Regions:
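Periplasmic/ER-lumenal interhelical loops and adjacent helix-loop junctions
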Residues: 230-315, 338-347, 351-356, 360, ...
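Membrane-embedded helix bundles of polyisoprenyl
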Residues: 14-20, 98-116, 120-175, 179-218, ...
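Active-site lumenal/periplasmic loops and adjacent helix-entry segments of GT-C-fold
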Residues: 19-162, 290-294, 564, 568-569
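Contiguous transmembrane helix-bundle modules in multi-pass membrane proteins
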Residues: 128, 152-155, 159, 171-175, ...
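Extracytoplasmic/lumenal acceptor-recognition loop(s) of multi-pass membrane glycoenzymes
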Residues: 51-53, 58, 70-73, 475-496, ...
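Active-site-proximal, structured, solvent-exposed surfaces of multi-pass membrane proteins
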Residues: 185, 688-794
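Aromatic-rich transmembrane-lumenal/periplasmic boundary elements in polytopic membrane proteins
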Residues: 18-61, 240-279, 529
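Aromatic/acidic, Gly/Pro-rich catalytic loop(s) in extracytoplasmic/lumenal soluble domains
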Residues: 617-679
Length: 794
């Protein structure tokens, strides 16, 4: 009963805050799975649940990029992602998903903070600070970084790492054999859970945990037995990593991704002290202030509070907290040094690990130490004289000045974080009254409880009880205040769904049903209004489609591209994601874009309408603002924005004779480099149903495939066809050496037309094709893809 009484204030605080968070989520629906990355993350999970196989690290579908590998953020061990598969309406699923993510984060932060040595009160305050400042819906109040609105799966990774760090720190601390075995097993299970939920992002999330955990362990000077148990836990993870083939999985993905930087590491500069000094002196680090110590950015003040708290912990504490505080200060400092090299472009392929990931990795520790200076008595900051000697006046003055400076800095931090909520809102008398009434209610409740407990003799000091109550009430009260001024958000509604409905009926894919062709969205932008945005953007020409989303959403209530189509299972040629392939970019930029077009590696897009090329890659429908298409395209409908007379109508055209796996070339032209292949495709583009360009010599044939059916299946496709002899089918899917015929059918897969798949067979075939790349697989296939790219000159 006494334990429940002690826990009750904490439970009430969390219950009230959780209820207000859910209310906020209902009023701020666009804070959950925010466009564009958040929408994409949600679609990615839902598509994997529908088209993927459990625990497949290379989930494959024809929904985007002509059979591209999904970004491997997998739902199978991620409860927040699995919630998106619940039979609820769309908004309810999002709320449940985020509620699960928030619960994971809160529990794991408390667990890690307690394992380091923080009190229950400070651990709870740290968890509530994290959830309130950085997690939807109240993250919109502060706009520090919309990370969890865009990439909510990171919450699961953070929770797994928090719990894993706590298990690792506890492992071997006692001689209890069952306990140590259980902790080693928990550490391995959490490692596997994080790794299999998001293989790449998980690795990016680990640096702070590695550095700070190592500092804590070294600071303890543990006995050999503890070292042995910790080494065993780490060894188990290494055995799983290397034994499951994950090393070649990472190397293969890096070798084929368009996102991998191609510039070499600038070792001459990295190893030069003079180059570093010049960089520190002349490079404006705060040109990208996000998450760095740049005071014009609101998030910098959270970092400042954490650094002050870490310094306070070093002076006033001993043990793990002191070691963790020192490690956090060193880590943030080194992260800023890394930021200089990252922004200067010195890191080459290692630049895929951006500075933002390094800071995001230590957010849990930042929030733990950010609460320290607010709850640590300032008197403990005063310097202690040795022995019983009295402190000199200088030391007294130094302690007083230090206390005042810390207090002023904390006030500035609070003001800077709380001012201008939601960017353009203001606090008024109503918010002041809400805060005062809520605080008064807390004080009244405390006095009432103390009076009741006083009768039974079980009562804490008034100061302790009131302090605990105020700390636990801070964030629920702030939530009440911020909800009172939160702007209401309305989700855009589609004004005329005729085009998307037509595509859903005639082009959507389902497991076990035939493939019916891709859709491509191509903006001509006749008046130069669709892609209006900053000129010096890394998006380059892809800004036409990036800014086009908002342009069409404001006028039509839909974007006519990407997740708006993928959510309806409408497959597209274009792709948005981190791992769009080098070969697909090479094809699109050389054959479906004007000369000199430059785009961002995350965007696979079409910039020119070439019906012959588009047919060959399987495009059947084109959404465009162009008025007409040549070569007999049939108009299937159009929509207009009545309230925007200058906005172009969006039209839907259907191309005749698209390649639905129905192109059966009989003649083959050999070409060895990408430029040569592109030239041969251009020369023969009017007969790509008869001619294919290959790198390996293939003899001509007279037999053509007939009765071809290409069926969508989980993690792959099935092709059935017949012929009168040796024949070939040009499949509208990206080629990879990882495509495997898994049912023993006599079919051979090779590369054609730079990045398409050519299937060769004799007389009859029923081939089940899967993309095999992941756990316990021969992942060297992806490395061979990378070697192909080099041989092609990509």
């Amino acid at each position: 009963m006494a334990a429940f009484a002690r826990a009750l204030p904490y439970l009430l605080s969390w219950a009230v805050l959780a209820g207000l968070v859910i209310v906020g989520m209902k009023g701020q629906p666009l804070a959950l799975y925010t466009p564009v990355d958040g929408e994409w993350a949600k679609w990615n999970v839902e598509a994997i649940l529908e088209f993927g196989k459990p625990f497949d690290l290379s989930p494959y579908s024809m929904l985007a990029g002509m059979g591209s590998m999904y970004f491997p953020n997998l739902p199978w061990l991620n409860p927040g992602a699995l919630a998106l598969g619940l039979p609820l309406d769309d908004r309810a699923k999002s709320i449940v998903s985020y509620a699960v993510y928030a619960a994971e984060l809160a529990v794991s932060i408390i667990l890690l903070a307690r394992s380091i040595g923080f009190s229950w009160l400070m651990a709870t305050a740290a968890a509530q600070l994290y959830v309130y400042l950085l997690f939807p819906p109240f993250a919109a109040v502060f706009r520090i970084y919309d990370w969890y609105s865009l990439a909510p799966y990171f919450a699961h990774l953070t929770a797994a790492l928090n719990a894993a760090a706590a298990a690792f720190l506890a492992c071997g601390r006692t001689r209890d054999l069952p306990r140590n075995i259980m902790l080693c097993g928990a550490f391995l299970a959490l490692f596997v859970s994080g790794l299999l939920s998001a293989p790449f992002t998980f690795v990016f999330a680990t640096p702070a945990y590695i550095a700070i955990s190592a500092a804590i362990v070294v600071g303890r000077r543990p006995p050999r037995g503890e070292w042995a148990w910790k080494a065993a836990a780490l060894l188990l993870c290494l055995v799983f990593f290397f034994g499951s083939g994950l090393l070649s999985y990472y190397l293969g993905t890096i070798a084929t991704s368009g996102r991998t930087p191609t510039s070499p590491v600038a070792w001459d500069k990295i190893l030069s002290l003079r180059a570093w000094l010049q960089l520190f002196a002349h490079h404006p680090l705060c040109q990208d202030p996000r998450l760095l110590l740049c005071i014009q950015d609101r998030g910098a003040w959270l970092n400042i509070a954490a650094l002050v708290g870490a310094a306070v912990a070093i002076v006033t504490r001993r043990g793990d907290i002191r070691s963790a505080g020192a490690a956090l200060i060193a880590y943030i400092g080194l992260a800023h040094v890394y930021a200089y090299a990252y922004q200067a472009g010195w890191l080459g392929p290692a630049g895929v690990l951006s500075t933002h990931f390094l800071i995001l990795s230590c957010w849990s520790f930042i929030c733990m130490f950010a609460v320290v200076p607010f709850f640590e008595p300032l008197s403990r900051l005063q310097l202690k004289a040795p022995g019983a000697a009295k402190r000199s006046q200088i030391k007294q003055l130094a302690g007083f000045v230090l206390s005042i400076a810390v207090a002023a800095l904390l006030v500035a931090t609070v003001v800077r974080l709380l001012r201008n909520p939601y960017d353009n809102s203001r606090y008024g008398p109503a918010q002041l009254m809400i805060g005062l009434v809520a605080l008064g209610a807390v004080v009244l409740a405390v006095e009432t409880v103390r009076a009741y407990r006083g009768k039974t003799g079980a009562v804490l000091s008034r100061e302790t009880t009131l302090r605990q109550a105020i700390v636990l009430a801070i964030f629920p009260i702030l939530a009440l205040v911020h909800l009172s001024i939160a702007p209401r958000q309305n989700v855009p509604t589609v004004r005329d769904a005729s085009l998307r409905n037509y595509l859903h009926e005639n082009a959507s894919i389902e497991v076990g049903r035939p493939f019916r062709g891709y859709t491509a969205t191509i903006w001509v932008d006749k008046y130069g209004e669709i892609g209006v945005g900053p000129r010096d953007t890394p998006l380059r020409d892809a800004k036409l489609y990036y800014y086009g989303r908002d342009y069409f959403s404001a006028r039509y209530g839909e974007t006519f591209t990407e997740t708006d189509l993928w959510d309806l299972n409408i497959p597209t040629f274009e792709e948005y994601g981190e791992w769009t392939s080098v070969q697909a970019h090479a094809f699109a930029l050389r054959l479906l874009a004007p000369s000199g077009t430059a785009t961002h590696s995350n965007y696979l897009r079409v910039f020119t309408i070439d019906p012959d090329i588009l047919r060959a890659v399987g495009v059947r429908y084109i959404l465009t603002d162009a008025e007409t298409l040549d070569q007999g395209a049939v108009a299937r409908g159009s929509v207009s924005a009545a309230n925007f007379p200058r906005s172009p109508p969006v039209r839907l055209f259907e191309l005749s004779n698209p390649n639905l796996g129905t192109y059966s070339p009989t003649q083959f032209i050999k070409a060895m480099t990408a430029d040569e292949i592109v030239q041969r495709i251009r020369e023969n583009k009017h007969r790509l149903d008869e001619v294919a360009v290959v790198s390996d010599g293939l003899p001509s044939t007279t037999a053509k495939a007939r009765n071809v059916v290409m069926i969508v299946e989980r993690d792959g496709l099935r092709v059935r066809a017949a012929s009168d002899g040796p024949a070939h089918i040009l499949l509208p899917v990206q080629f990879s050496h990882c495509l495997v015929v898994v049912n023993g059918a006599a079919a051979r897969l090779t590369r054609a037309n730079l990045f398409q798949t050519l299937m060769s067979f004799d007389r009859a075939v029923d081939a089940r094709i899967e993309f095999r790349f992941g756990l316990f697989a021969d992942n060297s296939c992806r490395l061979r893809d990378g070697l192909d790219n080099k041989a092609l000159g990509l």
